[in-house]
Amino acid sequence: MAKLWGGRFELDSSALLEEFNASIFFDKQLWQEDIKGSKAHAKMLHKIGVLSEEETQEIINGLEIIAQRISRGEFVFNASDEDIHMAIESALTALIGDVGKKLHTARSRNDQVALDFRLYVLKSNKEIVNLLLELMASILAIAKVHTSTIMPGMTHLQHAQPINFGFALVAWACNFKRDVERLLSDYTRNNKCPLGSGALAGTPYGNDRIFLTQELGFDEPTLNAMDSVSDRDFALDMLYSLSMIMMHISRVAEELVLWSSSEFKFISLSDEYATGSSIMPQKKNPDVPELLRGKSGRVYGELMGLLCVMKGLPFAYNKDTQEDKEGVFDALKNVGLCLRILKECLKTMSIHPENMYKMAKIGHLSATDLADFLVRECGVAFRDAHHITGQVVAYAESKGVDISDLSEKEIMGVDSRIKQGVKAVLCLEYSMNARNTLGGTAVTQTCHQIEVLESFVREQMACLQVGRSKNE
């Protein structure tokens, strides 16, 4: 098959080159963006006098027919087409004749692919934001029910201070809030139109790039043509943001694995989102959270792969950047799947408050409250209070009990500076609610945090709905 670029070549491409060079079997995912960009380009060519109104409409009608064929699965993609741009242009010319050959006037595949890929990433950005907001809403719905469910807060995976389960879930939601904010920042920074940049230096046709920008829903055109065709920062931004999402998902998954273990028993995963063992009949394995952890490495790899592709490229287009898409496609697919299944896993899990409370009674979680009591009520310097509290802990351990189980008389017997009323501060409920500063684990503070995050979710959901018309 003759190549659209084959005029100066005497020999046909080898079959091996066609196999090696073709990107059509993965960049065909960009077909909607390619057709959208071509329609806008055709309208712009009419505006600057290259196409007549009749020719413009003929091209647009032809592109719509091709779009219908692709969406119905009737369009055949061939390696000889090289990429989605050539496949659609060849099909258009075969469909409407020589008029189709005019479409590529004042356009290069360099700015064409920069447009298509950017449009795809921006569209995907909105989809991932939507999934994050849905996940946050599910987390917050659970958190609202458990603002008084006491559990052990941990540092170094050791019992530290009592918190409520809702507070722990709010911490998860805060991570995903930052992910949303990061993606929104990416969108604003990258919502610029590269079409009209040509191969690397602009075009001599007087392309109306402002018209293209408005037609395609961008905020503004890119500034420099050479940068426009060589820039893949938007793809790297997406991969970095996806990597951060997966890091946060992986940390949540780690807690789900721990909390569902026999040693914790804080939660039970639904049978719908757990698996069994091929040899041990009693097993119920947390495969979903384990796979969520594992997939984070895959997404990190896609980010590092594209960074390595881009690091040594001279400016303007290089064929190396054909390697930019598969990693992004794969990462988007996997992160989307991870967000959806994590949401369902959380919605269907069973929560065991009694086990959380039982474990909160182990490990002297109210020790800090004893030290604070010594400072506030007994006038003891904090370092001395720390030492005295350590002595009380040692005494409790010698008795085989938690410090909250000691009598007031026993506690006061450890050091003469300990005053009456100390027993009351060792209650887990008191300890949790004593942390009533902004950001603390007290019930009132946890409820406030939930309200703030729910408001954020509502606002961003509304903005997402309003913004769906842009770049779509």
Swiss-Prot record:
For this record, the Gene Ontology CC terms, alphabetical, are:
cytosol
Gene3D superfamilies named in the record: Fumarase/aspartase (C-terminal domain), Fumarase/aspartase (Central domain), Fumarase/aspartase (N-terminal domain)
Which pathway or pathways does this protein act in?
Amino-acid biosynthesis; L-arginine biosynthesis; L-arginine from L-ornithine and carbamoyl phosphate: step 3/3
Recorded GO molecular functions are: argininosuccinate lyase activity
State which gene encodes it. Answer: argH
Main EC class the enzyme belongs to: lyase
In its keyword annotation, does this UniProt entry include Lyase?
yes
Q: Which organism is it from?
A: Helicobacter hepaticus (strain ATCC 51449 / 3B1)
Provide the GO biological process annotations. arginine biosynthetic process via ornithine; L-arginine biosynthetic process
This protein's name: Argininosuccinate lyase
CDD domains, sorted? Argininosuccinate_lyase
Primary subcellular site in the record, as a coarse category: cytoplasm
- Protein's cellular compartments: Cytoplasm
State the SUPFAM superfamilies in the record: L-aspartase-like
EC number(s)?
Answer: 4.3.2.1
Q: Which PANTHER family match?
A: ARGININOSUCCINATE LYASE
The membrane-spanning stretches of this chain are none
> Its family?
Belongs to the lyase 1 family. Argininosuccinate lyase subfamily.
Membrane in keyword set: no
Q: Which UniProt key words apply to this protein?
A: Amino-acid biosynthesis, Arginine biosynthesis, Cytoplasm, Lyase
Catalytic activity reads: 2-(N(omega)-L-arginino)succinate = fumarate + L-arginine
